[in-house]
A protein has these predicted regions:
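Periplasmic-binding protein-like
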Residues: 59-69, 148-192, 196-211
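Bilobed "Venus flytrap"/periplasmic-binding protein-like clamshell domains
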Residues: 1-7, 64-122, 127, 204-209
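A ligand-binding cleft/hinge motif common to bilobed small-molecule-binding domains
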Residues: 37-49, 128-162
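Solvent-exposed coil/turn segments that connect beta secondary-structure elements
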Residues: 40-42, 70-73, 86, 91, ...
Length: 211
């Protein structure tokens, strides 16, 4: 990292990409990481804000969760959904891809006993499976790029507000210089990200305006 403040405070910068919820939980629960892009509920579940001082420095926007189909708008009705093939995320901590749809299905009296649930490793894989005809309905967010291959007319809202991804920094002291330097780093990452969702970043207050 070329930021002089970060170079001064850290001997080296190492990037770790978690491959599963297990990785994420382990890194947060044991205080392994200094900077993390995760959901707020994971930090709260392990008390990492109190134990390790994980502090939110920036956040991407909240979003909505949907049941998305290829040729018709799904109906939130047990009789309609019975026999359908569902695509969900194989990440129990994912709200739009796992928690929200599982909650809705449970409320409707649906489970793996009366519907076919297939699990996939990413939202990209969910879309591939839907387009390939492997499943009838997926649960996910709606991205701008989805307009190219899917129709929002065939997206049924499940939950209007799902907490977005957030950046947390380990701060066991009030290190304002580091707080502001890390904000600039994540802003640079956001500005250069290819996906529109990640280009939108809300910075926590406490620093001079970032240019």
């Amino acid at each position: 990292c070329s930021n002089k403040i970060i170079k001064r405070q850290y001997g080296e910068v190492r990037i770790v990409i978690g491959q599963s919820d297990y990785d994420t939980f382990r890194y947060i629960n044991h205080g392994v990481v200094d900077l993390a892009l995760i959901k707020k509920n994971v930090v709260e579940a392990f008390g990492a804000d109190e134990i390790y001082g994980l502090t939110r420095i920036a956040a991407h926007p909240n979003y909505s969760a949907y049941f998305i189909s290829l040729r018709e708008k799904p109906v939130l009705d047990k009789e309609y959904l019975l026999g359908k093939r569902f695509g969900l995320l194989d990440y129990p901590s994912s709200r739009s891809g796992h928690i929200v749809p599982k909650t809705v299905m449970q409320e409707l009296g649906l489970s793996a006993n009366n519907v076919d649930i297939n699990y996939y490793s990413s939202h990209k894989e969910l879309r591939r499976a839907l387009l390939a005809g492997e499943v009838d309905i997926i649960s996910s967010y709606w991205a701008v790029e989805d307009n190219e291959s899917l129709s929002k007319n065939y997206a049924m809202p499940l939950q209007e507000t799902v907490s977005g991804m957030q950046w947390f920094l380990k701060m066991q002291t009030k290190n304002t210089d580091l707080f502001c330097a890390m904000q600039q780093v994540v802003k640079d990452i956001s500005d250069s990200h290819p996906r529109p969702y990640y280009k939108t970043l809300i910075l926590e207050e406490g620093c001079a305006t970032h240019e």
